[in-house]
Amino acid sequence: YYREEYKHGLQQNPQFITLSRSFDSYLHPEGFAPLDAAPVSWVGDQDHEWRLDKEGIEEAIRDIIRSGDLGYGVVGSDIGGFSGSKIAPELYIRWTQFSAFCGLFLNGGHGERRLWERSLQELEIIRKFSWLHTELIPYIYSSLTNQRNGGQSLVSSGGGSYQYFFGQDIFCAPIFENSNSRTIKFPKGKWRYLFNPTNVYEGKKTLTFPLDEYPAFLREGAIIPMNVCRDYTGFGDSTSCGKTTLLINPGKTSLKFFVDPDTRKKYSVSVESKKGILIALDGEKPEYILKIIMDNSPLIVLADNQELVEKLEWNYIEADHLLIINPSSVIDRKQFYIQFRI
């Protein structure tokens, strides 16, 4: 059925998209819609509940991770659950946060969905994570391109309890209970907290996340392309609009390939850390801003062997452990070198 519908739709319009069901734990545990007929999927209707036995957010998280492991790409769930009367504020917020790190961000179903009719706290937090999902579209698009070429699924199991990788470089441990506490078993290596990169974790930890925070972490060596146009998330503001923000958490070496979701142009970014940090961009790169997580202020910053002007073309924010490089004629610059104080 799904394959025939999708085939017919494409005959009518080459840009046709259908919403299919990727996973049905009751009837088809091996997967529901065929992968070649599932451009966008959701995991059925959940209730406005937390627990698995009540078909709540726990079920949605489980089924989306299973869908990713089965090879589905763009998958999501009804934020807050589809069925029921009232959506508890804590549940609505946590479900939104989880959905920000899914391929599909879907806000539909029963209950009050007009944020201006809900609490100010819900409006501000849900707005923040809604925009974050939009900002991550360049990363999501490139991750899906990688998956289509035989690479890692956009969502894949990350060990522990309902933990998963979102693309190659983001690790998530969604909150599936009405609690701010989360025990996390981190994958091998060091992981920086996405919303406060001064915090680095490894091994097994029990951490606390207030309602406006969420367990999402950056791999050492991560390079995350983002489209930032507002100041809701903390990753930039309106001055970032029109440029690709490259959020970099340097490791020893990393090489990533990206596809711009608007132009379809391909480019690569490599990072090498030794005495300093060397960043090289190749291909049809977009205009960009570099945001590099660093624990110390640099001595000098070079672009194609020319020293950049501090405060004008680069700035180090000590409180955030973040170096921001926004040089003039940035699209023509191919290589950056960051030298530290000895």
Each language-model region and where it sits:
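Accessory, solvent-exposed terminal regions and/or long lumenal/extracellular loops of proteins
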Residues: 218-306, 320, 327-332, 341
